[in-house]
């Protein structure tokens, strides 16, 4: 993926300045299918970007932040773990028109719904006409910006963290690797599409010795139809990311019983006893959401506060 070699891949603001304008030492090491970029700042902040090449012409990267100094770091904000441009042919600006663009030529964004408690869960319609945001899944010079995010700190609530940008027979699929609140912004440029993804509202500093990683991204360019691209993506996930069938892992998923986390202790124990009593061939018991928070009706507001509900 040549376009990655000439880009910084991520961005953030450090103590009010664009990171790439700050005083720092940058080193790049290549080791086979992996490239490691390190940024060392005078105050001891160390940023490590690790890029791995996968099958199906895909790349993955993740950022690590570490305080190697003796004092707290400066403030890290506006952190975009992915900030790159995917090359696409230029589109001419056409100005206002009462007609929809040519559906066979316009750039489309397949951005599936997440869990929305409806018949449209994980459904993507790039030609949807929304009265409040006309064609929210098209990217054109006249409508160059689109923004997507999830809800409630749950990675696939309202919006799933998977995207497919396609123009005619060329496209790119990418996914955000984060289990909390994320944000994705797309901008049509003369050179292509600027893709930015991040953990929403980052604003933090690191104490001496602290080290964290932030969200990851996997990006896969393709040529051909949407169906071909989706199958290419499935092969990538199965071969490089799924644990099923890998050394030390079973060839199939476990057969489990799902129990609502808001159920009382007595209710949970009763069901486990019934499983044992009737020798139901369950391999595992899986506890769903609701075991945390202040009450059964408030579980959705307490994601991230993993304090068990004593009731």
Predicted regions mapped to residue ranges:
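Catalytic cores of glycan-processing enzymes that make or break glycosidic bonds
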Residues: 12-13, 60-81, 213-218, 251-259, ...
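Terminal connector regions
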Residues: 220-254
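Aromatic-lined carbohydrate-binding/catalytic grooves of carbohydrate-active enzymes
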Residues: 248-311
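Short, intrinsically disordered, charge-balanced linker/junction segments flanking boundaries
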Residues: 186-190, 308-311
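Short Pro-Gly-centered flexible turn/kink motifs
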Residues: 204-223
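Polysaccharide-binding surfaces and accessory modules of carbohydrate-active proteins
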Residues: 1-186, 200
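Short acidic, Pro/Gly- and aromatic-enriched capping/linker segments at domain boundaries
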Residues: 188-207
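Short, flexible loop/turn elements at secondary-structure junctions
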Residues: 55, 69, 178, 199, ...
């Amino acid at each position: 993926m040549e376009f990655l070699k000439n880009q910084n891949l991520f961005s953030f603001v450090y103590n009010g300045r664009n990171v790439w304008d700050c005083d720092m030492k940058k080193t790049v090491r290549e080791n086979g299918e992996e490239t490691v970029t390190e940024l060392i700042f005078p105050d001891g902040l160390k940023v490590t970007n690790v890029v791995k090449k996968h099958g199906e012409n895909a790349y993955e990267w993740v950022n690590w932040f570490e305080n190697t100094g003796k004092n707290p770091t400066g403030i890290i904000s506006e952190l975009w773990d992915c900030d790159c441009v995917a090359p696409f042919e230029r589109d001419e600006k056409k100005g206002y028109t009462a007609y929809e663009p040519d559906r066979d030529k316009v750039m489309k964004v397949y951005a599936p719904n997440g869990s929305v408690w409806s018949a449209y869960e994980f459904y993507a319609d790039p030609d949807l006409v929304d009265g409040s945001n006309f064609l929210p899944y098209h990217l054109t010079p006249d409508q160059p910006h689109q923004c997507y995010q999830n809800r409630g700190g749950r990675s696939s609530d309202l919006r799933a963290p998977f995207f497919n940008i396609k123009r005619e027979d060329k496209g790119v699929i990418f996914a955000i690797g984060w289990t909390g609140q994320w944000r994705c912004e797309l901008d049509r440029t003369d050179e292509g599409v600027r893709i930015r993804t991040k953990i929403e509202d980052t604003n933090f500093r690191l104490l001496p010795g602290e080290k964290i990683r932030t969200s990851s991204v996997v990006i896969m360019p393709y040529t051909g139809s949407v169906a071909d691209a989706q199958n290419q993506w499935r092969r990538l996930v199965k071969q490089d990311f799924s644990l099923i069938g890998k050394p030390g892992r079973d060839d199939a998923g476990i057969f489990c019983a799902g129990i609502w986390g808001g159920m009382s202790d007595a209710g949970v124990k009763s069901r486990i006893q019934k499983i044992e009593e009737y020798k139901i061939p369950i391999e595992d018991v899986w506890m769903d959401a609701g075991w945390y928070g202040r009450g059964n009706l408030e579980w959705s507001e307490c994601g991230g506060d993993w304090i068990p509900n004593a009731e």
